[in-house]
Amino acid sequence: MTLLDTINSREALCALNDAQLRQLCDGIRQFLVLNVARTGGHLASNLGVVELSVALERVFDTSRDRLLFDVGHQSYVHKILTGRRDEFRTLRMFGGLAGFPKPSESVTDPFVAGHASSSVSTALGMARARTLQHEDYHVVALMGDGAMTGGLAYEAMNDAGESSEQLIVILNDNGMSITPNVGGIAQHLALIRTRPGYYRIKKAYRAVTAKVPGGKCLYRLTHRLKEHWKRMLFGTTFFEEMGFEYYGPVDGHDLKRLEYMLRLVKDRRHPVLLHVITQKGKGYAPAEENPDVFHGIGHFDPEKGMEPRCGHLPTFSDTFSETIDALGAQEPRICAITAAMLRGTGLDAFAAHYPERCFDVGIAEGHAVSMAGGLAKQGMIPVVAIYSTFLQRAYDMLLQDVAMLGLHVVFAVDRAGLVGGDGETHHGVFDVNYLRSVPGMQVLCPASQAELGQMLRRAVLEMTGPVAVRYPRGCDGAFTGIAEQPCLREGKDITLVTYGTLINEVLAAAKLLEARGISAEVLKLPSIKPLDVRTVAASMRKTGRLLVAEEAVCIGCVGKELLASLRARGVGGPVRLCNLGDRFIPHGAVPELYRLAGLDAKSLADAAWEVCQNEA
């Protein structure tokens, strides 16, 4: 039994001495490496916050205090220390432990997290609720430095700094250049300010001046003089200008110092920011050397520190990367834009070859889309490479700054559809619905990597106006070619309609139906806006029945538009719409999620059978 195995309560954690705490931190890192190696997940960021997480759990009672994680992928250590250690073997699996904070898992997860830069907003809301309800608990927002590239963080800090709420923001700085007060004198000043005696003297001085005539005015005058000379000699941090009391930087791997600083800021009665310096991947050499690779990783060999290469197949993101790189050589007006996802979207090759035409704007999706509009207005051809779940953050800019002017901006929408282990915060299941609501928007849905390359070239070089090309995470399925016509399989009993890579399940369903004596016609739509209603109508007139399968929520889905359009054309008959419904889909392997939603081949075949038996 390891020391970590004995930590089953906060009391047990708080009882450890310094040597035991060092041993515990080493044990947590070993536990993380071994478990994430089996399940995949976010490793480097969690290795970097081991000491910080341990200190937070010792200083704060997270069953009562509110500890909010920005983004949330650095919450593994928190989960280990709050009763979920034994569930780590199920991390990111269907029905298992989520890879992000989840209130349904534990009272110590006060809020869901998954997207960046929102933690201070949520924390301020909780702090204000605490004040209004006359309750007593601490509110802490833990924000990675990357989240500080998102404008929402500054909106919240601007508001929080003007408030009088007791609020603690911890900035986990593991690589961004965020400059605090610099120089030996400034560091000495910070050291003085973090000594308890400093505050005892300050409190005593205020008490004495309050008792003498004109003492309050004297205190205010001396305080202003002190602040004036401090600013003259040492300057101020950006955070202080926003109204936060700033502490730091602090070594994020010095547990004793961290606890001291956390107890200090815990006693402040106004907004405070603690700046902590950590090393991403700390304690595991492969992750220290390649923190980006180990940020989010599949299962790997913990001894070699690498993913198994056998059976490695090119992904849709790889195809996008190769295609946009080739297009960059062909057309000098092409610019590529990403919001802090250069490697994830596959733009790293384009950035290496055409650095002056590649823009990583940080976690600023709205800015990325508006800037793309500006580039397009001046004759460039911007390609915004973005995950589906993050594009929804820029919906207003897409409407106002691109579509309203009919500008030719190409959106390469990666991770469209169900993404697997990252779960409900990351599934790309809303873009079908909101993109199709945008006037003038064209939406293409390749079903294979070959189609992705073809459609991307067409979108960039031939089409006009705003265009979205949406494609999934992962590799090709059984369908790998390029469909010349929508009809992939002729039939006479029922029409099966789908788009994108779900065609693989639909084709498999058609084979299952054939074994049951049902002849299914299969249509694959290359575009979901505009829709080829004519082809669907012609097929349904022949078969008399229709099933539409799609990896999207039901409100505003393709199936509903098809149904309305067919009815308007006088085409009737039994119809079944198979989609994700009006709900959030949990984490798990995509095949398991297909079964959950009724989108796997067997479920689709059963649904089509019911339609043919007039039981729909």
Annotated model-derived regions:
Residues 42-163, 316, 333-334, 338-339, ...:
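Cofactor-binding active-site loop characterized by glycine-rich and histidine/acidic residues
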Residues 260-263, 295-296, 315-330, 346-352, ...:
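Glycine-/acidic-rich phosphate or pyrophosphate-binding loops and their flanking alpha/beta elements
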Residues 299-303, 307-312, 420-422, 442, ...:
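Peripheral docking tails and interdomain loops at the edges
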Residues 218-286, 408-413, 433-481, 601-616:
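Structural signature of the thiamine diphosphate
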